[in-house]
Amino acid sequence: MYFMNLLTTIIPILLAVAFLTLLERKVLGYMQLRKGPNIVGPYGLLQPIADAIKLFTKEPLQPLTSSHVLFIIAPTLALTLALMMWIPLPMPHPLTNMNLSILFMLALSSLAVYGIMWSGWASNSKYALIGALRAVAQTISYEVTLAIIILSILLMNGSFALSTLITTQEHIWLILPSWPLAMMWFISTLAETNRAPFDLTEGESELVSGFNVEYAGGPSALFFLAEYANIIMMNALTIILFLGAHNNPMFPELYTTNFMIKALVLTTLFLWVRASYPRFRYDQLMHLLWKNFLPLTLVMCMWHVTLPIILAGIPPQT
C-alpha cells in the first residue's frame, strides 16, 4: 500500500518534469519568434517521450580517469533527493505528515549539494570541477537566505509543519504582509535551482556545460530530471508559504486544482525570466546575496520577532 502511495507521487512528478521541458522549449521558441519542437506527435507533444528514449538508450560513457562509483552515485543521489523533497508537501495531504517538515526539506536541499560536488570531482575534469565549485558556493550561499525567510514565515505560522500554513492563510495570503520576503524568496529560488539569470554553473560560454560536462545518456538525463523536479518543487513550496490555496474539506480536489494552476503560473514566470535576462557575473551573484539579501532578511526576521511582542500589550480592537 505504501509502495502505491509512493508511485502515485513519483510518476506524476516525472511526467510533469517531462512536459515542463517541452513547455520550456515551446515558450522560449515563441519568445524568440520560432516554433519550438513540432515534429514528434501532434504539436510536438510526444517530444519528451522521444527525448527520454533517446537518452536512456545511449551508451553511458565514462572517462577512464573518473572515479567510477561516485560517477554513478552522484546523478542517482541528485534525483533521489529531488524526489524525496516532495514527501512533506501538503497538496492538500502530504505523503508523510511530519511535525518538522520544513526542517526535513532544508536538510535535504543541503544534502543535494553533495551530488553536485561529487559529480564535478568524480569526473576528473577541470571544467566539471570549476562548475561544481561554483554550484556548491552558489547553492550554499542562497540556502542561508532561504532558511531565514522560511524562519520569518514560520514565526507568523507558529509551527514547523507545512500543513498548518493552509490554516494560517485562510483569510489572507502571506505574500501581502510579507511582500519583501516573497520577492527575495523568488529570486533566491531562481539561484538555488541554478536557473537563468543565475545559471553560472552551466556557463555555456566558458564552462561548456558545468559540473555535468562529462556525463552522457542516462546519467545526464538523471541530473536533468533532478533540476526540473527541483524547479517544480520550489514553486510548490512558494505557493504553500506565500499563496496558500483555501482548503475546503468537502472538496479536497479543488485545492489541488488551485494549487497546480498557481504552480504552472510560477513555473511560466521562471521561463519568462530565463528568456528575458542575461547571466549575472559571479561576483555580482555573490554581492547580491551577502551584501543585499542577507542584511535585509535578517532585519525582516528581527521585525517578525519583535512585532508580536510590541503588539502584545494592545487590547483587541472591536
Curated annotation (Swiss-Prot):
InterPro entries: NADH_UbQ_OxRdtase_su1/FPO (IPR001694), NADH_UbQ_OxRdtase_su1_CS (IPR018086). One of its GO terms (cellular component) is mitochondrial inner membrane. It is a multi-pass membrane protein. GO terms for biological process: mitochondrial electron transport, NADH to ubiquinone; mitochondrial respiratory chain complex I assembly. It is found in: Mitochondrion inner membrane. It catalyses: a ubiquinone + NADH + 5 H(+)(in) = a ubiquinol + NAD(+) + 4 H(+)(out). Its EC number is 7.1.1.2. PROSITE patterns: COMPLEX1_ND1_1, COMPLEX1_ND1_2. Keywords: Electron transport, Membrane, Mitochondrion, Mitochondrion inner membrane, NAD, Respiratory chain, Translocase, Transmembrane, Transmembrane helix, Transport, Ubiquinone. Core subunit of respiratory chain NADH dehydrogenase (Complex I) which is composed of 45 different subunits. Belongs to the complex I subunit 1 family. Core subunit of the mitochondrial membrane respiratory chain NADH dehydrogenase (Complex I) which catalyzes electron transfer from NADH through the respiratory chain, using ubiquinone as an electron acceptor. Essential for the catalytic activity and assembly of complex I. This is NADH-ubiquinone oxidoreductase chain 1. The gene is MT-ND1.
